[in-house]
Amino acid sequence: MYICKRKTKNDMKRILSLAFAIVLLATLPMQGQGKRYQVAGVAFYNLENLFDTIPNNPLGRDAEYTPNGARKWTGKRYWNKIHNLAYAISNMKTDLTPMGPAIIGVSEVENITVMQDLARDEQLKAWNLQVIHHDSPDRRGIDVGFLFNPRLFRPLNVTHHTLVVESNPNFRTRDQSCVSGLLLGEPVSVIVNHWPSRLGGQKQSSYLREAAAALSKHIADSVLAINPKQKIIIMGDLNDDPMDPSCAEVLGAKRNVKDVEEGGWYNPWWDVLASGVGTLAYRGQWNLFDQIIINYNLVGKDRSTLKYFKCKVHNDIPGIRTEEGDRTGYPLRTFASGVYLNGYSDHFPTQIFLTRELK
């Protein structure tokens, strides 16, 4: 929701001054080359069951996240969760992006209210994050969402897309949200996802994630049909790794930039996982489900427009890891085995950095 008011002459002067300061903040010297670049961070974070305390799911699927429910989800626990997540997000700023990520896609949020509460936390208040949210048909009552810094990204169009699986017509999952706008003034589209889980087995449920990947590709193709030069990002908790069929075959996201052809996709997380780094772990096995995949228009050596620079798993935020026991090094969750841990999420956040040379 946007609230607009008439701008005075002094307001416009302040806005222009702020815009100039933002350009300075978003630039850095490339060591040894004498060049300066603007940098934009684009991030994703699975917030793991960010429910409020009010029972409002028609099917009662949020009952455990109420004060009298199984999780004893009191106001105190809710606000602890908000504060912890805001702390993690505030630590996603880097030397390259002192204002934090321009865009943060999220998953497992119950409604727009929890996103607004997160954006208003004191640790994020200075960023003035704005919220885009859509209630989807997922039976658990969780959705994807979109946070953005309005000084760095301006949304122009938002669409939401429901996954329909012909062989399983009663299946319901999270809708995919496509947000198109201007990132540092350049047209960019971001498709935020939370693909179906591996419930029932990885292989047995793979067809659902492959269908979700096909929907993401269809959305992207529709955008490219209007503007073949559009920069597109597919992000989310994909519940698959980079080498799984949904990503590697249906999307066709490549491990090596040199293999990405026009109209194709690059997946920088393939090598990250191969190095032993993931975003979530189960029984000693790391996975990298939280991926940010980019299209052909975001790769290449031409730095006159925004291009991919590097990626990062934010597993080094102080306090975000489990420090003891058989889950040492894992993301510190809110609950584990039914025990309240006052943690963050069962996933680490991820981020890519896009750069553009300043002339």
Predicted regions and their residues:
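Second-shell loop/turn segments in exported
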Residues: 68-78, 100-106, 133-134, 165-167, ...
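Structural recognition of the beta-strand scaffold that forms the well-ordered cores
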Residues: 41-44, 102-107, 130-133, 145-148, ...
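Extracytoplasmic, non-cytosolic globular domains
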Residues: 133, 177-272
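Structured beta-strand-rich core segments of catalytic domains in phosphoester-bond hydrolases
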Residues: 109-195
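Catalytic metal-binding/acid-base residues of hydrolase active sites
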Residues: 48, 110, 196, 238-241, ...
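Bacterial Sec-dependent N-terminal signal peptides
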Residues: 1-37
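N-terminal, active-site-proximal structural segment of metallo-dependent hydrolase catalytic domains
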Residues: 32-124, 132-144, 320-328, 342, ...
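Metal-dependent phosphoester-hydrolase catalytic domains
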Residues: 33-34, 222-232, 240-359
